Amino acid sequence: MPTPATIKSYQDIKANIEGACQRIAPLWPLKHFVAVNPYVGLRDQPFWRADQTLRKITGKGLTMPRPYYEEQIANGRIIQEDLDEALKQMHSNWSVTQLKQVMKQRSASRNVPFPVFADAMFADDRRDWPGFVVERISQYCAAYFDEGQATWSMPWRDDPMYQAWLKFMHFDKSPRMVGLRGIGEAAAALPAAAETAIALALKELSVPFDLIDDYLFAALLSIGGWAGWARYLRWQAELKGETDQSLRDLLAIRVCWDAILHKTCADIAVRKQWHLMLHTQQNRAIEKPSEHVDAILQTALEIGYQRSLIKSLKEASRPSNTVIERPVAQAAFCIDVRSEIIRRALETVAPGIQTLGFAGFFGVLMEYVPFGSNAPKGHLPVIFNPPYRVCEDLSHASEDETQRHAAKRQLRLRVATAWKSFKTSAVSTFTFVEATGLLYAPKLFGDSMGWTRTVPHPDERGLDSGTKQRLRPRLIASGNGKSSAKSTGIPETERAGVGEFILKNMGLTQTFARLILLAGHGSTTVNNPQGTGLDCGACAGQTGEASARIAVTLLNDPATRRGLEEKGLKIPKDTYFIAGLHDTTTDEVTIFDTEDLPTTHAKDLAQLRQWLADAGELTRLERATLLGTASQAPEVVTRDMRRRTRDWAEVRPEWALAGNAAFIAAPRQRTRGVDLEGRAFLHDYDWHKDAGFSTLELIMTAPMVVANWINMQYYGSMVDNLRFGSGNKVLHNVVGGSIGVLEGNGGDLRVGFALQSLHDGKRWIHEPVRLNVVIEAPQAEMESIISRHILVRELVDNGWLYLFQIDDDGSVYRRVCDKQWPRMT
């Protein structure tokens, strides 16, 4: 290979490397598996230009296969009016008739992914060399990043990733086993610096300067799962003001594999094939969006949903300016689309109740430390850093009792870990099964029948039921049974400020009910590595229980209320907040800390419990339609949904956020009584009460962005499940402890959602449409926020979501280019 001194023409390679790394979306670990926009690195491009980029790099863009759209036209989901409007929006000169004629013509050209050198080898002998390279890198990454799953740890994990790989390659004999010679020697000749190695690799491969960016992006996407994990490590480091070079090092490893294969390849035909592939890419032509049939059809699909949504909103009752009488109760749920159904059901069984929508962390930016642990878990949107650390503690206990129970839990966890290590060790694998296998027969039978949980819930491991019932978050500093260098709790001087933030952004500043429920949400499943993806995204993939309970504790705190009153927020003395958890698998709501309520509110609590039970039944019956039990009696539906929480063979315990398509920030009266089919994120917002529009700014920069991430994660998982989804859930195997999953026993780390989260085996349950954001607020204020925040501006101006404004009279306007807002008819 050439020496660094000879690569003067690659002196600006650092910018290319950084550009490729920025294109990769982070992948959060399984312990808080939150949805991420897989195209977040392309948001600086208009949506349909990003489609062109992806088709050039991966061979697959941002649309579904043509037959999908043909089916939507055939069943009436896309109508003539939608096609007409789509052609206008895409600036196409075709008529609908011409479009349908072109639809019948299959393109003669095929989108070919941007090649890596292993593709040239595959083209020559049809052996899966690209798969071999991915397998070698994936196994290396699993060992290097392992978080405790491996019995033996890699010896070079303390070295930078690229330098550790150089040492690993010295011992890796697998290339020789598949007939590759000289790999180890070529790897040994690589430079020690990752950036220098990348430059040398590009020189070795003769990648033209104008293709460097595309090649580096393609190289990272060829190992996209592990690239996402490395991007996550960088993301976490940046939140702390630090740096992490794992992604750059992974890129160096990937391109060096290509360079090594090229250097050791003696076949002239393969080298010629490689240069031909590069030449083809340089002369490649991509369809314009106006001529891209599937882009027009995708736009028509989205217009069809907008037509239905806007019609429903226009037909809804208008918000009233009259003073609302005191509600019989108030219940705040997360903005999650699953909350839309239970909120609608609760308002049906109790018309006098007021429901609210707010992000499920309930405004408390914290990390939460489980009892007996010193490892905090984020309970806030992943785009924020937690200013507070709150500990779970044993209620009504002395310090000595707390320490005893914490020590007992720690001992149980250590014993469980040691027992698991013994069962999986090399010396006991066979003898253990032979000696004790029969003892596990009752549990195996119970687990198989779905009568028992296969394993305890992670939050309950090492705890007996009595201790579990006594655990709760503490507002004040707590030892939690463990020492901590970081102060815990929320300082008393800051509580009124936090309370004000919660109430104002929830839209709850007057007319307080006697009883106010803050209901977080979570899911209950077993044998589901990606189970945290069903929990609350606003709580970083945790349940909303801790967030709801700490918010309630704070809002009931007398000192906090005195501080709130000084800020002009007077909560009546007979108003009490109470925390709950909505189980989205069973639609049952558990209420916590009821012993804190005075006896004067016993009837209020009993009535609320009954309303929640009735609403849960209505919600289950509505959801049963998609779960195949719609014709069953209510008690049968309930039993089936409870079974799903324990059944280790259930691949579709619930549909989670499948179908999500809209984000609405408006007074509840705007959507109350409207069946939004569990497809809309609902955030309560009244701009008339938002002095300075700080709440509007928060909504557009946080919940709206998070909803876009969720929406795009589902979108990407459906239109390109191979790269941005996780394949078949049945084949998932956990790797690295809690890093992620492989499909089967090898290949790349998988990202996104499994097919079972999108498809019921017969038809698609999710519909790939970009998020439709509807906000009831002045256009000028929204434009001001768009202009101040580049992230929001990129999402809106580049078409990664649709933005609509709804006026006080119910008129709807769509935001288009040049800051124009034409009225929707």
From Swiss-Prot:
Residues that, per the record, bind Zn(2+): 334, 336, 521, 536
Self-association state and partner proteins as the record states: Forms a complex with DabB.
PANTHER family in UniProt: INORGANIC CARBON TRANSPORTER SUBUNIT DABA-RELATED (PTHR38344:SF1), UPF0753 PROTEIN AQ_863 (PTHR38344)
Cofactor(s) annotated in UniProt: Zn(2+)
Family, per entry: Belongs to the inorganic carbon transporter (TC 9.A.2) DabA family.
Protein name listed in UniProt: Probable inorganic carbon transporter subunit DabA
Keyword Zinc applies: yes
UniProt topology in membrane: Peripheral membrane protein
Signal peptide positions (record): none
Any one GO cellular component localisation term in the record: plasma membrane
Function according to Swiss-Prot or TrEMBL: Part of an energy-coupled inorganic carbon pump.
HAMAP family registered for this protein in UniProt: DabA
Domain of life: Bacteria
Keywords assigned: Cell inner membrane, Cell membrane, Membrane, Metal-binding, Transport, Zinc
MF terms (GO), sorted A to Z: zinc ion binding
Compartment annotation: Cell inner membrane
